[in-house]
Amino acid sequence: MNVEQQANAEQIALWNGAAGQGWVDAQESLDRVLEPFQHRIVEAVAARRPQSVLDVGCGTGSTTLAVSRLLAKRSTAVGVDISEPMIALARARAEREKAPPRFICADAQTHAFEPASFDMIVSRFGTMFFDDSVRAFKNLRRAAAKGAGLAVIVWRSAAENPFMTTAERAAAPFLPDMPARRPDEPGQFAFADRGRVYAILEKSGWSDIDIRPLDVECTLPLAELTTYLSKVGPASRAIQGLDERFHARVIETVRAAFDPFVHGTEVRFVAACWTVSARND
């Protein structure tokens, strides 16, 4: 096992298995849900007009593609992610672009990027999964040119994001062995603590650190909710392989738990996040 495989081994296995395939299957729904954050990242890039941008944890490539369209042929956009299924879809989507970005299947925590090769590093919910965040952001800073900007969006706490944990809470009585989330482990809410995020960036050498709360209403067509619940999140993975009737019962219970978020033909919820910016001096 090489150094890159040793680091983040659990996350690499997760995102190259059920989690990664689930995001591939739900790509269109997820892109719609997360579109407001993609716009934020694109706005940040537009304000700086960089020549080269790295999108960390790019997933199926939506944000990287949007940045690439903005920059057109005069600049370069690169997406990196540990998930082979998601990178494969990102590359397939890129083939349809006039000025396609480049996608790398690698762990941004350890990958040997060309030093000082990017003058902006961005991420839409892709930086909370490192098993050594200081090491990861040091590695990203090595890839950043002098004066390069960092612009990432991360989730705040689970308590502030009830939509994101409703499925787990509703499914828990049926799935007693479903692992509980821990706030200090790699995962969706790993950067909920503002002070921890600040300390990670400071220790990894970034400067001019700014962390601000961001609350955004997100929407999903009601018709897509059941598919979304079946493909995304810990509960979706926990119910895989269950007896068909039991599986249907769990999904029915979980779906009913989302009724408070249903408004007509839409599902709406407020996403509580941090916008994080910094600079490589």
Outline where the language-model segments fall.
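Conserved Class I S-adenosyl-L-methionine
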Residues: 2-4, 14, 19, 26, ...
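Conserved alpha-helix/loop element of class I SAM-dependent methyltransferases that forms part
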Residues: 32-51, 66
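Class I SAM-dependent methyltransferase SAM/SAH-binding core
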Residues: 52-111, 135
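Conserved hydrophobic residues forming the short capping helix/wall of the S-adenosyl-L-methionine
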Residues: 71, 94, 171, 258, ...
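A short acidic, Gly/Pro-enriched loop at the edge of an enzyme's catalytic core
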Residues: 109-120
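A short SAM/SAH-binding and catalytic strip from SAM-dependent methyltransferases
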Residues: 119-133, 156
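Conserved catalytic/acceptor-binding region of the Class I
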Residues: 134-135, 141-142, 146-220, 236
